[in-house]
A protein has these predicted regions:
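N-terminal and secondary-structure boundary signal
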Residues: 1-296
Length: 296
Protein backbone atom coordinates (compact mmCIF):
# COMPACT_ATOMS: atom_id res chain seq x y z
CA UNK A 1 0.00 0.00 0.00
CA UNK A 2 1.31 3.44 -0.90
CA UNK A 3 -0.06 6.84 0.02
CA UNK A 4 -1.14 9.14 -2.84
CA UNK A 5 -3.40 12.04 -1.99
CA UNK A 6 -3.89 13.38 -5.51
CA UNK A 7 -3.98 12.28 -9.14
CA UNK A 8 -1.87 15.31 -10.02
CA UNK A 9 1.11 14.29 -7.91
CA UNK A 10 4.12 12.19 -9.04
CA UNK A 11 2.06 9.02 -9.37
CA UNK A 12 4.50 7.22 -11.65
CA UNK A 13 7.21 7.67 -9.00
CA UNK A 14 4.91 6.25 -6.33
CA UNK A 15 4.13 3.27 -8.54
CA UNK A 16 7.77 2.72 -9.38
CA UNK A 17 8.66 2.55 -5.69
CA UNK A 18 5.93 -0.05 -5.18
CA UNK A 19 6.97 -2.04 -8.23
CA UNK A 20 10.50 -2.49 -6.85
CA UNK A 21 9.03 -5.29 -4.74
CA UNK A 22 7.42 -7.05 -7.72
CA UNK A 23 9.97 -6.64 -10.51
CA UNK A 24 11.64 -10.04 -9.86
CA UNK A 25 8.24 -11.77 -9.98
CA UNK A 26 6.60 -9.75 -12.78
CA UNK A 27 9.34 -8.77 -15.23
CA UNK A 28 8.09 -6.49 -18.00
CA UNK A 29 11.25 -5.50 -19.90
CA UNK A 30 10.78 -6.45 -23.54
CA UNK A 31 7.27 -7.77 -22.85
CA UNK A 32 3.83 -6.98 -24.22
CA UNK A 33 1.82 -5.59 -21.31
CA UNK A 34 -1.97 -5.46 -21.24
CA UNK A 35 -3.65 -3.03 -18.82
CA UNK A 36 -7.30 -3.63 -17.99
CA UNK A 37 -8.86 -0.60 -16.25
CA UNK A 38 -12.41 -0.46 -14.94
CA UNK A 39 -14.31 1.49 -17.61
CA UNK A 40 -18.04 0.92 -17.16
CA UNK A 41 -19.99 4.10 -17.93
CA UNK A 42 -19.18 7.79 -17.99
CA UNK A 43 -21.04 10.37 -15.92
CA UNK A 44 -19.26 13.66 -15.41
CA UNK A 45 -20.13 14.02 -11.72
CA UNK A 46 -19.34 10.43 -10.70
CA UNK A 47 -16.12 8.54 -9.98
CA UNK A 48 -17.15 5.29 -11.68
CA UNK A 49 -14.01 4.45 -13.65
CA UNK A 50 -10.33 3.98 -13.01
CA UNK A 51 -9.11 7.56 -13.30
CA UNK A 52 -7.43 8.24 -16.67
CA UNK A 53 -4.54 9.98 -14.87
CA UNK A 54 -4.02 6.79 -12.89
CA UNK A 55 -3.95 4.74 -16.09
CA UNK A 56 -1.47 7.23 -17.53
CA UNK A 57 0.82 6.83 -14.51
CA UNK A 58 0.76 3.03 -14.87
CA UNK A 59 1.61 3.39 -18.56
CA UNK A 60 4.54 5.62 -17.60
CA UNK A 61 5.69 3.04 -15.04
CA UNK A 62 5.83 0.25 -17.61
CA UNK A 63 7.50 2.49 -20.17
CA UNK A 64 10.23 3.13 -17.60
CA UNK A 65 10.45 -0.61 -17.02
CA UNK A 66 11.15 -1.18 -20.71
CA UNK A 67 7.93 -2.81 -21.90
CA UNK A 68 8.07 -3.55 -25.62
CA UNK A 69 4.37 -2.71 -26.06
CA UNK A 70 1.58 -1.49 -23.80
CA UNK A 71 -2.07 -2.03 -24.67
CA UNK A 72 -5.11 -0.80 -22.74
CA UNK A 73 -8.20 -2.95 -23.18
CA UNK A 74 -11.72 -3.21 -21.78
CA UNK A 75 -15.05 -4.81 -22.63
CA UNK A 76 -17.67 -2.65 -20.87
CA UNK A 77 -20.82 -4.46 -19.83
CA UNK A 78 -23.22 -1.56 -20.43
CA UNK A 79 -22.20 0.70 -23.32
CA UNK A 80 -21.73 -0.77 -26.78
CA UNK A 81 -20.16 2.39 -28.21
CA UNK A 82 -16.85 1.85 -26.48
CA UNK A 83 -14.90 4.47 -28.41
CA UNK A 84 -17.37 7.14 -27.31
CA UNK A 85 -16.89 5.99 -23.71
CA UNK A 86 -13.10 6.07 -24.05
CA UNK A 87 -13.16 9.60 -25.43
CA UNK A 88 -15.77 11.07 -23.07
CA UNK A 89 -14.09 9.62 -19.98
CA UNK A 90 -10.80 11.33 -20.80
CA UNK A 91 -8.98 8.04 -21.28
CA UNK A 92 -8.64 8.68 -25.01
CA UNK A 93 -6.57 11.82 -24.43
CA UNK A 94 -4.23 9.93 -22.11
CA UNK A 95 -3.75 7.07 -24.57
CA UNK A 96 -3.06 9.44 -27.45
CA UNK A 97 -0.53 11.36 -25.36
CA UNK A 98 1.33 8.12 -24.60
CA UNK A 99 0.92 6.58 -28.05
CA UNK A 100 -0.91 3.57 -26.60
CA UNK A 101 -3.69 1.78 -28.46
CA UNK A 102 -7.06 0.74 -27.02
CA UNK A 103 -8.74 -2.60 -27.77
CA UNK A 104 -12.49 -3.15 -27.40
CA UNK A 105 -12.58 -6.62 -25.84
CA UNK A 106 -16.30 -6.98 -26.44
CA UNK A 107 -15.60 -7.38 -30.15
CA UNK A 108 -12.21 -9.04 -29.88
CA UNK A 109 -11.51 -12.50 -31.29
CA UNK A 110 -12.92 -15.06 -28.83
CA UNK A 111 -10.81 -18.09 -27.93
CA UNK A 112 -12.53 -21.19 -26.56
CA UNK A 113 -10.59 -22.06 -23.41
CA UNK A 114 -10.95 -24.89 -20.92
CA UNK A 115 -12.61 -23.55 -17.77
CA UNK A 116 -10.22 -24.33 -14.92
CA UNK A 117 -12.60 -23.20 -12.20
CA UNK A 118 -15.83 -25.06 -13.04
CA UNK A 119 -17.77 -23.08 -10.41
CA UNK A 120 -20.31 -22.01 -13.05
CA UNK A 121 -20.78 -25.48 -14.49
CA UNK A 122 -19.40 -24.27 -17.84
CA UNK A 123 -16.83 -26.56 -19.44
CA UNK A 124 -15.26 -23.73 -21.43
CA UNK A 125 -14.97 -19.95 -21.35
CA UNK A 126 -14.56 -17.71 -24.39
CA UNK A 127 -11.64 -15.43 -23.59
CA UNK A 128 -10.26 -12.52 -25.57
CA UNK A 129 -7.35 -13.19 -27.93
CA UNK A 130 -5.80 -9.84 -26.98
CA UNK A 131 -5.80 -10.78 -23.29
CA UNK A 132 -4.50 -14.29 -23.87
CA UNK A 133 -1.67 -13.12 -26.12
CA UNK A 134 -0.27 -10.59 -23.63
CA UNK A 135 2.95 -11.49 -21.82
CA UNK A 136 1.94 -9.51 -18.74
CA UNK A 137 -1.70 -9.02 -17.72
CA UNK A 138 -2.50 -6.27 -15.20
CA UNK A 139 -5.85 -5.52 -13.55
CA UNK A 140 -6.40 -1.79 -12.82
CA UNK A 141 -9.64 -1.49 -10.86
CA UNK A 142 -11.26 1.37 -8.98
CA UNK A 143 -11.81 0.97 -5.21
CA UNK A 144 -15.62 0.65 -5.07
CA UNK A 145 -18.49 -0.98 -3.28
CA UNK A 146 -20.89 -3.09 -5.34
CA UNK A 147 -24.56 -3.75 -4.67
CA UNK A 148 -24.32 -7.40 -5.74
CA UNK A 149 -20.72 -8.38 -4.99
CA UNK A 150 -20.10 -6.25 -1.88
CA UNK A 151 -17.03 -4.72 -3.51
CA UNK A 152 -15.69 -4.54 -7.05
CA UNK A 153 -11.91 -4.73 -7.17
CA UNK A 154 -9.19 -6.52 -9.14
CA UNK A 155 -11.10 -9.81 -9.48
CA UNK A 156 -14.51 -8.41 -10.38
CA UNK A 157 -12.69 -6.25 -12.93
CA UNK A 158 -12.07 -9.43 -14.96
CA UNK A 159 -15.71 -9.52 -16.11
CA UNK A 160 -14.69 -6.98 -18.73
CA UNK A 161 -12.17 -9.36 -20.30
CA UNK A 162 -14.82 -11.66 -21.78
CA UNK A 163 -16.24 -10.66 -25.18
CA UNK A 164 -19.75 -9.27 -25.18
CA UNK A 165 -20.33 -10.88 -28.57
CA UNK A 166 -20.28 -14.21 -26.72
CA UNK A 167 -21.86 -13.30 -23.38
CA UNK A 168 -24.14 -10.37 -24.13
CA UNK A 169 -24.54 -7.00 -22.45
CA UNK A 170 -24.02 -6.87 -19.49
CA UNK A 171 -22.39 -10.32 -19.79
CA UNK A 172 -25.81 -11.81 -19.10
CA UNK A 173 -24.94 -15.48 -18.94
CA UNK A 174 -22.25 -14.84 -16.35
CA UNK A 175 -24.75 -13.01 -14.15
CA UNK A 176 -27.18 -15.90 -14.46
CA UNK A 177 -24.46 -18.39 -13.55
CA UNK A 178 -23.60 -16.34 -10.45
CA UNK A 179 -21.27 -13.37 -10.18
CA UNK A 180 -18.87 -14.90 -7.61
CA UNK A 181 -18.80 -18.22 -9.49
CA UNK A 182 -18.06 -16.48 -12.79
CA UNK A 183 -15.35 -14.25 -11.34
CA UNK A 184 -13.52 -17.18 -9.79
CA UNK A 185 -13.77 -19.23 -13.00
CA UNK A 186 -12.32 -16.39 -15.07
CA UNK A 187 -9.52 -15.70 -12.59
CA UNK A 188 -8.52 -19.36 -12.30
CA UNK A 189 -8.59 -19.85 -16.07
CA UNK A 190 -6.41 -16.84 -16.87
CA UNK A 191 -4.93 -15.21 -13.78
CA UNK A 192 -3.54 -11.66 -14.01
CA UNK A 193 0.08 -11.25 -13.05
CA UNK A 194 -0.45 -8.03 -11.10
CA UNK A 195 -3.16 -5.77 -9.71
CA UNK A 196 -2.83 -2.02 -9.20
CA UNK A 197 -5.85 -0.49 -7.47
CA UNK A 198 -6.89 3.14 -7.86
CA UNK A 199 -7.85 3.94 -4.28
CA UNK A 200 -6.98 7.62 -4.42
CA UNK A 201 -10.69 8.42 -4.66
CA UNK A 202 -13.04 5.47 -4.35
CA UNK A 203 -16.81 5.03 -4.45
CA UNK A 204 -18.99 4.14 -1.46
CA UNK A 205 -22.68 3.41 -1.14
CA UNK A 206 -24.68 2.20 -4.11
CA UNK A 207 -21.73 1.19 -6.29
CA UNK A 208 -20.61 0.37 -8.88
CA UNK A 209 -22.47 3.23 -10.63
CA UNK A 210 -24.61 5.27 -8.26
CA UNK A 211 -22.44 5.66 -5.18
CA UNK A 212 -20.61 8.75 -3.99
CA UNK A 213 -16.94 9.73 -4.07
CA UNK A 214 -14.84 8.62 -1.10
CA UNK A 215 -11.27 9.98 -0.82
CA UNK A 216 -8.88 7.36 0.56
CA UNK A 217 -5.46 8.38 -0.78
CA UNK A 218 -4.23 4.82 -1.36
CA UNK A 219 -2.65 2.86 -4.18
CA UNK A 220 -2.64 -0.89 -3.65
CA UNK A 221 -0.35 -3.17 -5.68
CA UNK A 222 0.04 -6.92 -5.46
CA UNK A 223 0.63 -10.16 -7.33
CA UNK A 224 -1.96 -12.16 -5.35
CA UNK A 225 -5.32 -10.74 -6.43
CA UNK A 226 -7.25 -12.32 -3.57
CA UNK A 227 -4.85 -10.76 -1.08
CA UNK A 228 -5.07 -7.41 -2.88
CA UNK A 229 -8.87 -7.43 -2.79
CA UNK A 230 -9.00 -8.59 0.83
CA UNK A 231 -6.62 -5.76 1.75
CA UNK A 232 -8.75 -3.26 -0.17
CA UNK A 233 -11.81 -4.46 1.74
CA UNK A 234 -9.98 -3.84 4.99
CA UNK A 235 -9.11 -0.35 3.77
CA UNK A 236 -12.86 0.17 3.24
CA UNK A 237 -13.61 -1.52 6.60
CA UNK A 238 -15.61 -4.22 4.85
CA UNK A 239 -15.24 -7.82 6.10
CA UNK A 240 -13.52 -9.66 3.20
CA UNK A 241 -14.45 -13.06 4.65
CA UNK A 242 -18.13 -12.23 4.08
CA UNK A 243 -17.75 -11.48 0.37
CA UNK A 244 -18.71 -14.64 -1.54
CA UNK A 245 -16.19 -13.94 -4.32
CA UNK A 246 -13.24 -13.75 -1.93
CA UNK A 247 -14.39 -16.65 0.24
CA UNK A 248 -14.83 -18.81 -2.86
CA UNK A 249 -11.51 -17.70 -4.37
CA UNK A 250 -9.66 -18.52 -1.16
CA UNK A 251 -11.41 -21.91 -0.97
CA UNK A 252 -10.19 -22.65 -4.53
CA UNK A 253 -6.63 -21.66 -3.52
CA UNK A 254 -6.57 -18.71 -5.89
CA UNK A 255 -4.93 -16.59 -3.19
CA UNK A 256 -4.80 -15.56 0.46
CA UNK A 257 -7.61 -13.88 2.35
CA UNK A 258 -6.48 -14.03 6.00
CA UNK A 259 -4.71 -10.86 7.08
CA UNK A 260 -2.10 -12.77 9.07
CA UNK A 261 -1.09 -14.72 5.96
CA UNK A 262 -0.68 -11.72 3.64
CA UNK A 263 2.84 -10.25 3.45
CA UNK A 264 2.01 -6.54 3.66
CA UNK A 265 4.50 -3.83 2.73
CA UNK A 266 4.37 -0.05 2.72
CA UNK A 267 1.66 1.82 4.60
CA UNK A 268 -0.21 -0.23 7.20
CA UNK A 269 -3.91 -0.76 6.55
CA UNK A 270 -4.82 1.12 9.73
CA UNK A 271 -3.06 4.28 8.51
CA UNK A 272 -5.42 4.72 5.54
CA UNK A 273 -8.50 2.67 6.44
CA UNK A 274 -11.79 4.58 6.35
CA UNK A 275 -15.30 3.20 6.73
CA UNK A 276 -17.21 3.02 3.45
CA UNK A 277 -20.98 3.22 3.41
CA UNK A 278 -22.34 -0.15 2.31
CA UNK A 279 -24.65 -0.51 -0.67
CA UNK A 280 -28.34 -0.69 0.26
CA UNK A 281 -29.60 -4.24 0.94
CA UNK A 282 -26.13 -5.69 0.29
CA UNK A 283 -26.43 -7.85 3.42
CA UNK A 284 -28.57 -10.24 1.37
CA UNK A 285 -25.64 -10.82 -0.98
CA UNK A 286 -23.00 -11.44 1.71
CA UNK A 287 -22.18 -14.50 3.74
CA UNK A 288 -23.32 -14.39 7.35
CA UNK A 289 -20.62 -14.27 10.02
CA UNK A 290 -21.34 -17.95 10.73
CA UNK A 291 -21.04 -18.90 7.05
CA UNK A 292 -17.79 -16.95 6.75
CA UNK A 293 -16.35 -18.70 9.77
CA UNK A 294 -17.31 -22.10 8.33
CA UNK A 295 -15.84 -21.23 4.90
CA UNK A 296 -12.53 -20.14 6.43
Amino acid sequence: IARADSYDGPLADVLQSQFEHFRPHVPVAGKRVLLKPNLVEYHKAKVINTDPRFVGAVIELFKREGAAEIVVAEGPGHWRNVQFLVNESGLGDVLRAHGVRFVDLNHDEPVKTLNLGRMTGLDHLYLSQTVLSADVFVSLPKLKTHHWAGATLSLKNLFGTLPGICYGWPKNELHWRGIPHSIVDIALTHTPHLAVVDGIVGMEGDGPLNGTAKPVGAVVMGADLVAVDATCCRLMKLPPERLPTLAMAAMKRLGRIREAEIPQLGEPVAALATAFEWPPKVEKQLLTAEQAATAS
